[in-house]
Amino acid sequence: MISRRYFMMGTAVLPVAACGTAPEKRAGTAPGEVERLASTIQAMRADVDPEEASRAASIAFAHTRALAIQYQITDPPLVHNTKVNMGLKPRGLCWHWAEDMETRLNAEGFETLEMSRAIAEGRGFRIDHSTAIINARGDDYTNGVVLDPWREGGTLFFAPVAEDTRYFWEAREVVLGRRQDLRSVAG
């Protein structure tokens, strides 16, 4: 039997369920965006290999598009999340994007770059949000660059962590550890 909550979510989603444009029909990456991301990655530290920065940027944009097609993104992020949670779409929650982006870029075996993950905990009306971060090898995630394809519904957002004013990012392991501690105390 369908719960009231899922019925209400479905009712809210139906009017906009077919409003979006399929990702394969959207315009591609804006001119200069790959180069801008490559420059942002390279600017993290002097020893970042320019070829690796360029390759990482190119892959990040291409993989965002591939995931948007795979996840069947046609809606804004929160509408898509509702569809995933209702079983209408296969994947596409923010942590799916972060996990898949991290896995893809880690597969490159970069020598001067590495991936990490961060979470912005929900406060007030906001929900938790996860993202992938690319950093210079051995550096702290706070000096890295946010790679967030979820935020704009299958269009890659990127910015240095310190310049991303929309979210307060914390290392994923710190947030998950804090939650585990809270469960232990409550449990």
Where are these regions (language model features)?
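N-terminal secretory signal peptides and thylakoid transit peptides that target proteins
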Residues: 1-15
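Bacterial Sec signal peptide processing site at the extreme N-terminus
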Residues: 19-39
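Secondary-structure boundary elements
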Residues: 36-82
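Solvent-exposed, acidic/flexible segments
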Residues: 46-53, 87-98, 125
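Mid-length scaffold segments of soluble, non-membrane domains
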Residues: 82-116
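Hydrophobic/aromatic-rich core segments of domains that either
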Residues: 106-156
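A recognition module on extended beta-rich or small alphabeta surfaces enriched in W/G with H and D/E
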Residues: 139-187
